[in-house]
Regions:
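Mixed-charge (Asp/Glu-Lys/Arg
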Residues: 1-44, 50-171
Length: 171
């Protein structure tokens, strides 16, 4: 045991780095997404961006992201949310997206460090309304088994659909 007065790195700082590495490796595995994530940063509201890229690696669409880590999400074994994973979403990012501070589509990622599963929510206007979060610091979200990235190609396809839908709405 050290008697040093030097500040120490927290377990949380290492866990944050691990969660970002897990997410970056997954998203960039096909070279169709390029990530720009920050760790140990003090930027309010979001943790970075990722870009969908075309065959020439030109950016096609940028998404903003919030990345949260959890030691282990527990699957509900009883009640109305049986089979789902409860997570307490912090609402500051939700409010940031709802207030249209950015026009980029927004994704809320939750990385389960024990299983290395990456859960995600696309924060569409409909999703934000359904979450009913205003005036609250957190809101419980019930992740379904289908709301984690089990196949990166499916996630890329869904991200492309989000981009095309947003593009059509803007025109």
């Amino acid at each position: 045991m050290s008697n040093s007065m030097i500040s120490k790195h927290s377990k949380s700082a290492f866990d944050e780095s691990e969660s970002i590495r897990i997410l970056e490796e997954l998203l960039e595995s096909t070279r169709e997404i390029k990530t720009f994530f920050s760790e140990n940063d003090r930027t309010p509201n979001y943790d970075g961006t990722f870009e969908l890229v075309n065959n020439e690696c030109e950016p096609v669409k940028q998404f903003i992201v919030q990345i949260k880590k959890v030691d282990k999400l527990i699957q509900n074994t009883k009640g109305k949310n049986i089979g789902k994973y409860d997570y307490s979403l912090k609402t500051n990012f939700l409010q940031y997206v709802k207030d249209k501070v950015t026009e980029c589509p927004a994704i809320y990622f939750v990385v389960d460090l024990s299983t290395k599963k990456v859960f995600w929510i696309y924060l569409s206007d409909e999703t934000l309304m359904r979450l009913n979060f205003e005036g609250k610091k957190t809101v419980t979200y019930h992740f379904q088994e289908t709301e984690f990235i089990s196949d990166i190609n499916s996630f890329i396809l869904e991200s492309s659909r989000i981009h095309l839908k947003n593009h059509a709405l803007a025109n």
